[in-house]
Amino acid sequence: MEEFVNPCKIKVIGVGGGGSNAVNRMYEDGIEGVELYAINTDVQHLSTLKVPNKIQIGEKVTRGLGAGAKPEVGEEAALEDIDKIKEILRDTDMVFISAGLGGGTGTGAAPVIAKTAKEMGILTVAVATLPFRFEGPRKMEKALKGLEKLKESSDAYIVIHNDKIKELSNRTLTIKDAFKEVDSVLSKAVRGITSIVVTPAVINVDFADVRTTLEEGGLSIIGMGEGRGDEKADIAVEKAVTSPLLEGNTIEGARRLLVTIWTSEDIPYDIVDEVMERIHSKVHPEAEIIFGAVLEPQEQDFIRVAIVATDFPEEKFQVGEKEVKFKVIKKEEKEEPKEEPKPLSDTTYLEEEEIPAVIRRKNKRLL
């Protein structure tokens, strides 16, 4: 049997405690075809991980004790060891950078690593996790500020909100299971990209297509759905285009997509056409869609749809029960007049760029 090898070099870097945990989970799950790295300022946390490639940063500034929930310390730690980071990124085609936002190392160091990767010509995708609502508005404010920096430093980014875990299952999740679900998002995103690139296909999709879709793509959605039976097309598309784990959670309005369909050999062309029509109806009318198709001879009455969607006209985030929209300001656009900002509360979140630093400090004192 012919063995297919991934022609592109993909690395996954977990930054800080949350990001490193996600990468460690991938290592324990035995993901293949990628190199895994955990980067942290906290030596004790690194020692608990099984992933082989563990890198300490910021020894001088943190003495191995962590960043103390201060993003500026995490940033300084990354800059202290920038040569070490560049060495890790050498000979890389694509990098996923995973970080939990709202703390110190992930929030501060991840944007530095992403910026370095992008400057080296590497396709850079950030996978960022926002904190639970019960962690308070101050941590969320810090996380959103870190996300802004990460957005500017990456080609594309995927945002997960911890509070959305409860939407994944009807059963009661344990704490361990809940965080496993969060960690699995990174794994599924990486597996999705690698499977698209290396799987022999009737209509092939290669790494150049992945780059076309994700490069400078901004907010991204990666969805996958499977279906069988009479309603298989509806089921597969609905699962693929709606991702409750992810912020934005819909492909509506996307202007760049990569769609791969796996089908059993008994599936008629009409079903594939129906799937693509349904996807077309949900995205921008002039969206650029790269299409791939894979036959699954061992399956029967089966269809799977994988979608990578980017280049959205507006970024939508769900924070607690409030939807917050972040307008994507293009260079040719002008910002609309700003309203007088209001103090933050546990139920109200303002756009980070709309709050002057002096007001933010005042609001923090009011809390």
UniProtKB/Swiss-Prot annotation:
SMART domains, per database record: Tubulin, Tubulin_C
Record Pfam families: FtsZ_C, Tubulin
Entry binding sites for GTP: G17, G18, G19, S20, N21, G104, T105, G106, E135, K139, D183
A molecular function GO annotation: GTPase activity
Keywords, sorted A to Z: Cell cycle, Cell division, Cytoplasm, GTP-binding, Nucleotide-binding, Septation
Subcellular location: Cytoplasm
InterPro entries given in the database record: Cell_div_FtsZ (IPR000158), Cell_div_FtsZ_CS (IPR020805), FtsZ/CetZ (IPR045061), FtsZ_C (IPR024757), Tub_FtsZ_C (IPR008280), Tubulin/FtsZ-like_C (IPR037103), Tubulin/FtsZ_2-layer-sand-dom (IPR018316), Tubulin/FtsZ_GTPase_sf (IPR036525)
GO biological process, one term: division septum assembly
HAMAP family given in the database record: FtsZ (MF_00909)
PANTHER family in alphabetical order: CELL DIVISION PROTEIN FTSZ-RELATED, MITOCHONDRIAL DIVISION PROTEIN FSZA
NCBIfam families xrefs: ftsZ
Protein role: Essential cell division protein that forms a contractile ring structure (Z ring) at the future cell division site. The regulation of the ring assembly controls the timing and the location of cell division. One of the functions of the FtsZ ring is to recruit other cell division proteins to the septum to produce a new cell wall between the dividing cells. Binds GTP and shows GTPase activity.
Assembly behavior: Homodimer. Polymerizes to form a dynamic ring structure in a strictly GTP-dependent manner. Interacts directly with several other division proteins.
Family: Belongs to the FtsZ family.
UniProt protein name: Cell division protein FtsZ
Source species: Aquifex aeolicus (strain VF5)
Lineage: Bacteria, Pseudomonadati, Aquificota, Aquificia, Aquificales
Gene name per UniProt: ftsZ
